[in-house]
Every structure is written in structure tokens, then in C-alpha cells.
Amino acid sequence: MGFLKFCRIYPIVFLLIIFTDMKAQVNNKDNLMIGAEIFIEPGQSDYNVEGWFNTLLENNMEITRIRMFENYMKNEHGGWDFRLFDRAFSYAEKYHIKVYANLFPATDFTDVGGFKFPADEEHLNRIADYVKNVVIHFKEFSSLYGWVPINEPGGGNMNDPLAQKLYNTWLKEQNAKIEKDKLTDYHHPSFDHEKFLRYYNTWYLKWLTDEIRKYDSVNPVHVNNHAIFNLASQYDFPAWRTFLSSLGGSAHASWHFGFFTRRKYALAMSANSEILRSGAGNIPWFMTELQGGNNIYSGIEPMCPTKEEIGQWLWITIGAGSKGAIYWCLNPRASGSEAGEWAMVDFQNRPTDRLMEAGRIGTVLKEHQQLFSVAKPLNSKIHVVHVKESMWVENRLARDSSKDEIRLPGAVMKSALSYFEAFSYMGLQPSLEELGEFDFYHSSYQGHTMVLSHQIAIPVKYHDKLRYFVRKGGRLMIDGLTGYYDENAICIMINDFPLKDLFGGSVSEFKYMGNLFSLQIDGENLPTYALKGSIHPQSDSHNQVQKIICSDDHKIYGLINDYGEGNVVWIPSPIGLGARIADNYKPFIEFLQRHIDLSDAIRFEPFLDNVMMKTLKSGDEYITIVINKSDSEKTVKIMAPFALRNPAMLFSNGTAFIKNNLLEIGSEEIAVIHWNTH
């Protein structure tokens, strides 16, 4: 297969290769589809398998995903025997269900999620043979919708022979690009491991996609990442766009939402979805796995979703632009560590209230197919940005045993999430994107706000891009240790801080304050966490205007620095993380409202704790999805910069009522409202 040659040329040509036949099959105007995964394993009766496909149909589900176990495709002589899966695909045809085939090469029975990388070249060749046989055989079924080349990439082992061989090749190429003087340049820790893991995830995913394309150039290729709040720095989504048809994800509350309490799982789903939407860019995205049922021994935080949560999670993904979702799972597997768990049918194969609730939503989507198929998320011009290098540096330096959250892995992401949460309670729809995904090529950023909250490492290559964003009218909001390190974990705030012109000064010092303390900003006390940074203002301001917004004892703790046509709001203390840890967003939100112009945004007035809204635009019509996670009924005033007329309730799971722009909505309720502007 010319493996080593391919390894050498791949890094050079990878970003230049765009396969035109990959993007034509799934587009951003496709109808929305919902479904549930049917788990196929030996021992299932013909009656039950057919019944599951019929159950999907009866509950307005159009799509399923099937895990294509190689272990269940070989007879006692080692020959291929596809009968178990042929039956499933045939019933899918009978009941008009589309199938995403999830490739799952042979692995140990206890390997629940599948291996993430091949062990060696011989293993890679076996995988290639498996892909060839499965794709050639199952592409003949009309029920085949597309391929998932690997289940939940990310977090794999890099100690195997193949990984080491690729790593050595990759490292030589990286070192050839680096010019370094050992006597004058700062020494720093190596982040080659993190960089290579990101590269390797992409390499293997593209290799699998290329193997599929040898035998099927038509059907879509889609993948579901997972644990996005922990593994985001491993995923090179812009590179994936060049060969995938669509992007997906697994968002299981019991596995992946450890940064959140259960009340805030809807918020977690919203943040997860926005990360995927940003990652997908110009290709569609589709939530590949949503938790559908109960945990007993699996998961980290065991739970059984309520029917209300099932509906909330689905509507949130739709509000973030997903072309639908598949629940894991319709039927429970009978064996293994997840036996009897996760299902949307009961042990007698009857629909649970969770399945019926998803089916109700499916009915609404079918009845309003045209409205939803062309609907796009209406972003609030607020960009909450996380930085992969910040996650790398934090993971390297953090103390897992620390009792202080600021010193634990995750503070970087939680800081970004704190702003996302605050904006969500204002009824806004912020984006949540990696710095490398942000579009720095517009001629104007008037009305746009970028948030860099405790993003501790900012690569030097972005310094001028951030200057450009602000100079062209953008507002940059910075808190915590943002910009403390460069991409090599070198502290750039000591001596001559390279961003002092943009930020409005340099940090004089940080003081560790323990747990929560207060900063008085604009005359109001804000909960702040752990670190207090004082500012030495820029003396040579080049006619820049600075406004002090936080000071005491002759020290400055916060300022606004005008720069070009925009400005920077800088508070070098973790005020976002402070609001999150205190679970007191009121003063923080009031601070944000003073410094961000929201007059052109659809929003709540006033803000509402634990209430959120996603907004879609479909032609000249609008759809608002409001979810009340508080413990009481709320009156929600929906404001817009233009007249929203003729509100009509498309879906409610309770007694929600809308009149003009006032919505009455009970605890745990969902209200999906259709508006027009004429």
C-alpha cells in the first residue's frame, strides 16, 4: 500500500486535498432526521429485530446507526458471513429507515467504545481488508445512508509501534522547520506529544475515509467525536472538513458532562452543540449520539433521562443547527458492560415515555419540514473562544490532587463556559469556538465581541490577528490569566509584554487569594476566584483612551483600552470562573450588559437564571426555542431589534403560553415558537 511513502507525503498535501464528491451528499438544506441506534448482536430473534425497525417508523424516526462488529461477521472458519447484518439492513429497507453504518473492526469483547488507533502496520492491513469487504457488501443496500469510519475518535494510545513510527517521521519534519539558538532562546517544555496526537487523530480518520472511498464514492462519511470539553484540543476540525461529508458528536450526560450539575445538562448540551457547529464550518453537522436511557454500571454519573430532558436535548441541538440526532440506543444490548442499559424501549420492547416524546418532536419536524430544513442558527455576534494551546499548557502544569479549581485541569474550558452560561441566561446565542476556527478576514467587526476568559496560552501568531479584530471595530473581553504564556508555556508577561498596546498595559503581578473574593467593578461587587491581577497601564498610549473600571489602594485591577475602532475590556482576575463557582451570575451579567451593546440581538429582558433560548432564522421567519430549567414558572419577555409578529406555538411539553412577546413557561418546559416579521 506504499504505507511509509504515504506517511511522508501526507503532511505536505493533506490540507490541499479536497474531495469534491464528499460534500454533495449531505448539505445544509437537508431535511432534519431523528432516530435511535439499533444494537445488533448474536442471539436476537427475527421477530425482535423487525419489531425495532417498525418501532422507529411508528415513532417518526427515519434514521438509525448500526455498529458493524467484525467479530459478528466471521464464521467458525474465519470466512465472511454477513447474515446477521443483512437481516437488519433488509428490515431497514422494508420500513424505510436510513442506516449509518459504524465501522467497528475486530477488538476485544470488553472494548465498549472501540480502539482509537491501529497497533501496527499488520493491524492496519487487517483493518483495510475489513473496510473493503464491509463497504463492498453493504453499499448495495438501498437502506445504507452513510458511513461512520470510527466510533468516538480521541484519547487513544500512542505507545504502539505504528504510532511510534509515524511519530518519528512527523517529528523529523517538525524539527526541520525550527530554527533555534540554544544560547539565546528560552528553553521550554515540548508539546510534541499534544501536537502529534492531534495530527494522528486526523491522519487515521482520513486514512479510514480514503479506504471507504476506494469502494464507495457516493455515500456520506460522518464521524462522532466525544467528551468535547476534555478532548477539544485533540480535534483539528478545519482539517476534517476537507474530507468528511458532515461532522457529528456523542453528547452523553452520564459520560461527558462532568463539568456540570444535572440542572445544567441542557446548558452543557448547548455548549457541546455550539463547539460542533463551529468545528463543522461550511459542512453540516448532526448529533450522532444522545443518551436515550438508563445507566446502571456504565457512565461516570449514572442517570436515567426524563422525557423532558430527552426533548430539551434534541431541541437544543436543532437550535444550534444540527440536521437532527440519533439516540443511543433504541434497544438494550444483552451482553457486555452496558447490558440492559441506555435503551428507549423497555425490556418488553414497548416504547418508553422518552421514546414517545422524541416521536412527538419528529411529528413537528415532519409537519414543518420546509421551515426547519433551511433554518440557520442566528448568532448573537458574541464569540466565546477557547484555545487548544491553553488546554495543552494547563494539562501539563495542573495539579490533579489540588483542592483549588484554578489549579486543576479544566479551568480553562470552565472559564469559557462561564461566559457562555451568562450569555445564555440573557437569551443570547453566542458561538463557542476554538481560536483557530475564528474568521479573522472580515473588513469590519463592528458589533462583534470576542471573549478570551482565562485562556492562559495565546500563540504568538494570533497577536496581530487579535489587534486586527479590535482595530476593525471589535470588542475584546479578557479576564484571568489570558495571555500569560505563549504556545511554549513561556511566560510573556514578565519584562516587555508584547500585547501591552492592545490590552492597555502589562500585569504588575498576580496574587493568589485563596477561594472566592470580590472585585468592585463599575461600583458593583463581582465574585472573583483565586487570583487577583494588578495592571501597570501603558504609558505610551499613542493617543489611545483608557478608562479605569476597577481600582483600589492606588492599584488598577481593570480597564477599558480603546484601540483603533474597537476596544479591550481587561480584568486580569477570573471573574467568569468566580461567577460560575459562586453560582451567582446576577452581578456578572449586569457587568456584561454595561459593556456589550445588545440592541441588535434577540434576547431576554431582563435576564433569567437557568432559562435559555436558541434562535433560528428561516428565510424571513424566526423560530425561538425556550427552555426553563429553573424550579418555578417564568414570564419571559423576548426582545428583538425588529418587530416579531404572529407568534405561534409549534411545540410545548407543558402549558406554555405566548401572547405578543411575553411567554409563560413552567419548570422543565420547552416552548418552540414560530414568528414572522410582516
Task: Annotate each predicted stretch with a short phrase.
Residues 222-225, 230-413, 510-514, 521, ...:
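Hydrophobic targeting/anchoring helices
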